[in-house]
C-alpha cells in the first residue's frame, strides 16, 4: 500500500496514519474523526438492532435476526452469571458496550490506506478510522462507567455506607482510616484507568502493526509477498483480539457495577 498524498518517509507515513483530524488547541482539541466514527457506529448499532427488533417474528427467523438474538442471549447469560443484584439497566448497558466497542474495534480490519486515501482525495489531510485507538474515546467510556459505579454505590449503600466502604475496609479500625481511604481510593480510580488503557493499548498496538505491514508493500517484491502473508495472519489473529477486548470491557463493567450493588 502506498501513502496517501505526496510521498512520505516511513516515519512520516506512520505518523500520518496515527494523527487525528483535529480542531482547537490544548485541552479543547476535538478529534473530529474519532467523534465521527464513534457516533456513526453507535447510531448504526441502534438502527440495526431496532430494525431487527421491529421486524422480529415468532416464525422462522432470518439470518440477521438469528445473529442478533445470538448476541443478545450471549450478553444476557453473561450478565446473569456475573451480576448478582437486580437492575434492568445492566443488560442493555452490557449489550451496548459489547457491540459498540466491537464495531469500533472492527474498523481496524479496514485496510489502513483505504479511508485515508478517500479523505485525501476530498482534501482532508488526516483521517484516523479506529476510535478505540484514541485515548479520548476509551477514557470517555471508562469515565462513564466510573460515574455509574459511584452513582449505584451511593444509591444502594447510601452516602454513609459509601463513605464507610472507603474508610473502614480492608482494616476495620478507626486508626486505619487514612490507610483504608488511600487504598480504596486508589482501587476505585484504577478501575476506569485500567478499562481505558487496556482497550487503547491493545487496539493502538494492533493498528501500528497493520501500518508497519503496509509499509512492506512499498518495498521490493520479496517484502511485498511477505507483507501479504503477515497481513493475512495478523488479520485472523486480530479478529480474536478485537472481540476479546470488547468482551473484557463489557465483563469488567458488569463486575464493577455488581460490586457497587453489594451492600456490606
UniProtKB/Swiss-Prot annotation:
CDD domains in alphabetical order: ATP-synt_Fo_a_6
Any single GO BP term: proton motive force-driven plasma membrane ATP synthesis
Subcellular location: Cell inner membrane
A Pfam family of this chain: ATP-synt_A
Highest taxon in the source lineage: Bacteria
UniProt keyword Ion transport present: yes
A GO cellular-component term linked to this record: proton-transporting ATP synthase complex
Listed InterPro entries: ATP_syn_F0_a_bact/chloroplast, ATP_synth_F0_asu, ATP_synth_F0_asu_AS, F0_ATP_A_sf
GO MF annotations in UniProt: proton-transporting ATP synthase activity, rotational mechanism
Principal place of residence: membrane
Record key words, sorted: ATP synthesis, Cell inner membrane, Cell membrane, CF(0), Hydrogen ion transport, Ion transport, Membrane, Transmembrane, Transmembrane helix, Transport
Topology in membrane: Multi-pass membrane protein
SUPFAM superfamilies named in the record: F1F0 ATP synthase subunit A
Family: Belongs to the ATPase A chain family.
Assembly with partners or alone: F-type ATPases have 2 components, CF(1) - the catalytic core - and CF(0) - the membrane proton channel. CF(1) has five subunits: alpha(3), beta(3), gamma(1), delta(1), epsilon(1). CF(0) has three main subunits: a(1), b(2) and c(9-12). The alpha and beta chains form an alternating ring which encloses part of the gamma chain. CF(1) is attached to CF(0) by a central stalk formed by the gamma and epsilon chains, while a peripheral stalk is formed by the delta and b chains.
Protein function: Key component of the proton channel; it plays a direct role in the translocation of protons across the membrane.
The protein, known as: ATP synthase subunit a
